[in-house]
Each structure stands twice: as structure tokens, then as C-alpha cells.
Amino acid sequence: MATCAADLAPLLGPVAANATDYLCNRFADTTSAVDATYLLFSAYLVFAMQLGFAMLCAGSVRAKNTMNIMLTNVLDAAAGALFYYLFGFAFAFGTPSNGFIGKQFFGLKHMPQTGFDYDFFLFQWAFAIAAAGITSGSIAERTQFVAYLIYSAFLTGFVYPVVSHWIWSADGWASASRTSGPLLFGSGVIDFAGSGVVHMVGGVAGLWGALIEGPRIGRFDHAGRSVALKGHSASLVVLGTFLLWFGWYGFNPGSFTTILKTYGPAGGINGQWSGVGRTAVTTTLAGSVAALTTLFGKRLQTGHWNVVDVCNGLLGGFAAITAGCSVVDPWAAIICGFVSAWVLIGLNALAARLKFDDPLEAAQLHGGCGAWGILFTALFARQKYVEEIYGAGRPYGLFMGGGGKLLAAHVIQILVIFGWVSCTMGPLFYGLKKLGLLRISAEDETSGMDLTRHGGFAYVYHDEDEHDKSGVGGFMLRSAQTRVEPAAAAASNSNNQV
């Protein structure tokens, strides 16, 4: 949405030149203000996903580790803010730079400037901490707190920003928005909101963390058979899932970063606002179909209607559609969600056979479904939407008649993300293990980190009247199966006195 004095002069006459300049400047200011408000609101929605991650993680672990996993989610956001401010944003979007890594804006120096204002930093920080939150789920219930500090800072300050520079910056070697050199296969990578940049990065990092640490005590029996260590609260899992669903409407539609932009002749549907709405619809359909497919797929597999499996299936659909949400039709999003559900089910079965333990299925969900989403986009991206967002003459989906160039670029993306994260996070986790800084002791793991590392339990119930009568201040929930009730504690206390 833009105008200029030359556009208005024929209407107002030559004597109105100053007036037209003034009006055009006001139009430009209004457009910038609306776009900034849209981006800030999207950033707030994406940040709200941290609450969803916290609730999802808390419900997926045993009660004795609840405080630990929630503290790591707070740490991801807080440490991520500092290190993304100091280094991460510069590595990701510092321009001018080379195709590999940015080299401006350290500590937000020289900000704001055209194209890079503080709202954009906040939006990108919310994405960076989402990747770190994914990884924390893979290594839950057995990782030392200092290891979280180290990996979170490294991931948000260096590993993730480099990948986002490749794919999203104007200088990145694989970016579809590249302005400083040739596009990869004449196309660049269309990873609109980060199936690869966010979800694969977090998932592959979690894969290496979980592999190097090994499974939790009791996860597999002496014969190698899988033993379910179920999370303690399906209610928290559902709450976290809905919060993440809500936040995804900032994650995917918000990745347009602006809303007042026209695509052609003036008209209600010829603008970016229509693309924003379509992106919200494709996101909704992919997640919903993935949830339903998982519901019936797991019912056939296990004989149960499992709400936790459905929630994970839903999130897998969201992770998959994130790459192509803006460039595919709603009917294609249904295919994306359907396939992503089976990708997750299959990878979970493979993980059990390989004795791979990921308490939140993060590597399978975000890594596996994210990779599928990258391939899906290369198959189903529609020419009209690609050209509206990225420019005319771009390759589009193979199944839509666009040839194989986009698919080739996306295969390269999957390979380089897996290789980069493996070469950076793998040695980091291995080094932490050799230094004795990665895994907690068997005694601490058995007792639970809330008690041994955080000074108490997550769930404490106090009843003042009961306390006055019995001298016992309530109960602490020690695990999903074991807790001390006030009445039982009072009876025990009376017996001891006798």
C-alpha cells in the first residue's frame, strides 16, 4: 500500500504539490505503523508458544522432574534473549555480509535502519528460542542444568542463526529472497516459516543430545523391550498443545512480516492480507488432519484412543506445513497433514526398535515432520503464490508443473541442515559428556531432579485447617503414582507418637 506525489498531482493539480507530498508521507507512515503493529502482535503470539512448550513438556515428563523441565523453558527464553541480542541476530541478518554468516548488528548496533527495526528483532528472537525449546524436550529427565545453559546459548547464539542466514537473509546462499548473487537452482529454498530452519534444527540437535546421553533409566528392560515412562499429566499436554496451536497463527501468518502490500490491481483479494488468511487456513487444516489421522492410526496400532498421541500428531502437522503454508492450496495442506501423521507414527516405531529415547518425541516430530514439510513444499507449491511472494519466473512445485529445480534446492536444504547441526551440536554434546557435564547421576535420576537439584517438588498442597489439626502441611506429589495425602500423613504421625 503505497502512493506518491506523482500519483496524486493529476487529481489535485500542480499547485497542490506540497500537499500531495505531505499526504504521501502520511500514507507511508501509516503503512509502516500498521505493518509494525502486525509484526509485533505476531511476535507476541510466537512468544506465547513458550508457555505452550512449558506446559507440553511438564505434562510429558514424570512429576518428579516437572520443576526441572519448566525451569529449562524459562532458561531457553532468558538466555536466548541475551545471546541472540549479542550475537545471534547479527549472524542471521547482519548485512552486508557473505552467503554463510552475517557480520553486522552485534548487540543491535546500527539499529534501527531500513528493513531492520526492533520489531523484526523481537520476532526473530521468538523463533530462535522455539528451536532451543524443541531440543530441551529430547534430553528431558536426565540432563544436568549446566548442560542446558551451555547448549541453549550455543544454539540460539550461533547454530540456529547461521541456518536462518542461509535461508532467510537477503545475502544467504540458499535464500529465495537473495539479492546479492544467483539463486540456488534458480529458485532458492522456500522455507517460509521454518520447517527446516526452526523445526529441523531443533529436532536434529535433540536427536544428537538424546543419542549421546542414552535412554532414561528404565526406558528399556533387560531384554531390550520398550517400557513406557508416561508423562504425569495429559491435562497439561492438552493445554500446552492448544497454546501452541494458538501461537502458530503468529508463527506462520506472521512470517509475512507485513500485511499492507498489494499483489496486483486494486481489489479486496489482491493483497498480502489475503495471503495471510490463506496461510492461517492451511496451517489449521494440516494440523487438524494430522490429529485425526493419528487418532485412528494409533487406534488401529494400539487399540486405544490416546490423547497424547493425538496432540503430538497435531503438532507434527503444524511442523510440516510451516515451510509451505503460504504457497500451497488448502487441499494440499490436507495431504501434508495426512502424511505427516504417518511419518511420526513410523519414526516413533523406528525409535523404539533402535532403543532411542526422546521423552517428547521432539526429534521425530520436529526433525522428521519438518523434513517432510520441506519436501512437501517442493512438490505442491503453486505458481501464483510463489510469484506473489518471491517474484515472477520462479520454479514452483513439481506436482504442480513447475519442474524439479525447487525439489533439488529443498533436498540440498535437508542435507545441509542435518550436516551443519550434526557437526556443531554433536561435538558439543559429546564434549559435555566427556567432561561429566551432560548427564546426572543414576541416583539423582531415580529420585528425580526436582528433589535432588531444585530443592523440592513441583506439586505442594497446603490446607491450613488440616495443618492446624494434624501438624502436617499437606502433600507433595512425588510421582504420577505415589503421593502422601494429608490424612495418611496425619495417621502415620499418630502411629509414630504411639
Curated annotation (Swiss-Prot):
Cellular component terms (Gene Ontology): plasma membrane
PROSITE patterns linked to this entry: AMMONIUM_TRANSP
InterPro entries per the UniProt record, alphabetical: Ammonium/urea_transptr (IPR029020), Ammonium_transpt (IPR001905), Ammonium_transpt_CS (IPR018047), NH4_transpt_AmtB-like_dom (IPR024041)
Provide the alphabetized UniProt keywords: Ammonia transport, Membrane, Transmembrane, Transmembrane helix, Transport
Key word Membrane present? yes
Q: Name one GO molecular function term.
A: ammonium channel activity
> Which residue ranges run through the membrane?
39-59, 74-94, 120-140, 148-168, 192-212, 236-256, 274-296, 307-327, 331-351, 360-380, 411-431
GO terms in the biological process aspect are: ammonium homeostasis; ammonium transmembrane transport
Q: How does it sit in the membrane?
A: Multi-pass membrane protein
Location comes to:
Membrane
What are the inducing conditions? By ammonium or glutamine supply in roots.
Q: List the expressing tissues.
A: Expressed in roots and shoots.
Q: NCBIfam families from the xrefs?
A: amt
- Stated family: Belongs to the ammonia transporter channel (TC 1.A.11.2) family.
| Purpose | Ammonium transporter probably involved in ammonium uptake from the soil.
Indicate what this protein is called per its UniProt record: Ammonium transporter 1 member 1
In its UniProt entry, the species of origin is given as Oryza sativa subsp. japonica (Rice)
